[in-house]
């Protein structure tokens, strides 16, 4: 039976981001109706880590809103990493904190972070259409810095932003050049507060995107993330095809500002597809 890796997310700093990413409700440019807070309490993060690990999650990603890492965020993430690792839960810790230089990433590595997540989101050519406050090249350099720091790299993108198939191929080719160990695959869901006017991808087109990703990234862990609940709805037959077409990792629980599937019910559904849950990160 196919083994599936479960990863979970903790939004440890939410909202008030000064970047203008057109797909993100955390941007202060869009005034999304989301929870906003500076730093989540350490005790709450530890409770989340314990609960999600008990459900079977092996990856735990600490996400901060904002353009980039700074000294305060570095210290905060390092503190969380040390506290979680002290629990000996066996979690693979990922940080997702925006643009970062080599020194910052080495600091996080030494504090106990195992991987860094920084998505390319789309192609270099299409990126200026969805963000003007930073460049695609900055994202790519941060990914390179993570690798140079000796961290694992988690990097992927979003499908359904009105990009072309050529853009999708260009993004996947760039990702392949980085050889990430994990590639999150997100499907954009239309939101009235966001400026992107794009219809939700059909399940068939989403599956084609997965097939394409598998072609370019045969050795990466392909992780279905945001948008799965809407694109596949209650269509179990189509959702099961995700795993036939190359998906071998799933985000368990909620996303940054949107609800995911209820973890226990989601796991029951995955088991009904004949999948098994990985018990080790390796």
Swiss-Prot record:
Ranges for domain Radical SAM core: 1-228
Cofactor: [4Fe-4S] cluster; [2Fe-2S] cluster
Keywords in alphabetical order: 2Fe-2S, 4Fe-4S, Biotin biosynthesis, Iron, Iron-sulfur, Metal-binding, S-adenosyl-L-methionine, Transferase
Catalytic activity: (4R,5S)-dethiobiotin + (sulfur carrier)-SH + 2 reduced [2Fe-2S]-[ferredoxin] + 2 S-adenosyl-L-methionine = (sulfur carrier)-H + biotin + 2 5'-deoxyadenosine + 2 L-methionine + 2 oxidized [2Fe-2S]-[ferredoxin]
Residues the record lists as binding [2Fe-2S] cluster: 61, 96, 154, 221
Keyword 4Fe-4S belongs to the record: yes
Binding positions for [4Fe-4S] cluster per the UniProt entry: 17, 21, 24
Cross-referenced SMART domains: BATS, Elp3
Entry's Gene Ontology BP terms: biotin biosynthetic process
Superkingdom of the source species: Bacteria
Pathway: Cofactor biosynthesis; biotin biosynthesis; biotin from 7,8-diaminononanoate: step 2/2
InterPro entries the record matches: Aldolase_TIM (IPR013785), BATS_dom (IPR010722), Biotin_synth/BioAB (IPR002684), Biotin_synthase (IPR024177), Elp3/MiaA/NifB-like_rSAM (IPR006638), rSAM (IPR007197)
Pfam families in the record: BATS, Radical_SAM
GO molecular function: 2 iron, 2 sulfur cluster binding; 4 iron, 4 sulfur cluster binding; biotin synthase activity; iron ion binding
Cofactor binding note of this UniProt entry: Binds 1 [4Fe-4S] cluster. The cluster is coordinated with 3 cysteines and an exchangeable S-adenosyl-L-methionine.
EC number: 2.8.1.6
Protein family (similarity comment): Belongs to the radical SAM superfamily. Biotin synthase family.
Role noted for this protein: Catalyzes the conversion of dethiobiotin (DTB) to biotin by the insertion of a sulfur atom into dethiobiotin via a radical-based mechanism.
PANTHER family in the cross-refs: BIOTIN SYNTHASE, BIOTIN SYNTHASE, MITOCHONDRIAL
Subunit architecture: Homodimer.
Annotated protein name in UniProt: Biotin synthase
Source organism of the structure: Helicobacter pylori (strain J99 / ATCC 700824)
Lineage: Bacteria, Pseudomonadati, Campylobacterota, Epsilonproteobacteria, Campylobacterales
Gene: bioB
């Amino acid at each position: 039976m196919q083994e599936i890796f479960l990863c979970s997310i903790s939004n440890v700093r939410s909202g008030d981001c000064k970047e203008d990413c057109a797909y993100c409700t955390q941007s202060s440019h869009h005034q999304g109706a989301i929870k906003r807070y500076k730093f989540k309490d350490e005790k709450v993060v530890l409770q989340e880590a314990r609960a999600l690990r008990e459900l079977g999650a092996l990856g735990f990603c600490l996400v901060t809103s904002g353009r980039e890492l700074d000294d305060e965020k570095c210290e905060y993430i390092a503190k969380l990493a040390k506290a979680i690792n002290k629990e000996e839960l066996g979690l693979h810790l990922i940080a997702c904190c925006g643009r970062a230089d080599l020194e910052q990433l080495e600091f996080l590595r030494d504090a106990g972070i195992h991987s860094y997540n920084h998505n390319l989101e789309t192609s270099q050519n299409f990126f200026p259409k969805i963000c003007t406050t930073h460049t695609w090249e900055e994202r790519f350099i941060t990914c390179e810095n993570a690798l140079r720091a000796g961290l694992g790299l988690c990097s992927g993108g979003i499908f359904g932003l009105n990009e072309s198939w050529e853009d999708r191929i260009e993004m996947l080719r760039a990702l392949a050049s980085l050889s990430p160990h994990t590639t999150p695959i997100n499907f954009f869901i239309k939101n009235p507060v966001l400026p992107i006017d794009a219809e939700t991808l059909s399940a068939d087109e989403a599956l084609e995107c997965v097939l394409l990703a598998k072609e370019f990234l045969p050795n990466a862990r392909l992780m279905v993330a945001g948008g799965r609940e809407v694109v596949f709805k209650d269509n179990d037959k189509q959702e099961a095809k995700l795993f036939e077409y190359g998906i071998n990792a799933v985000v368990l629980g909620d996303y940054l500002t949107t609800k995911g599937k209820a973890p226990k019910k989601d796991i029951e559904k995955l088991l009904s597809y004949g999948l098994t849950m990985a018990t080790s990160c390796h």
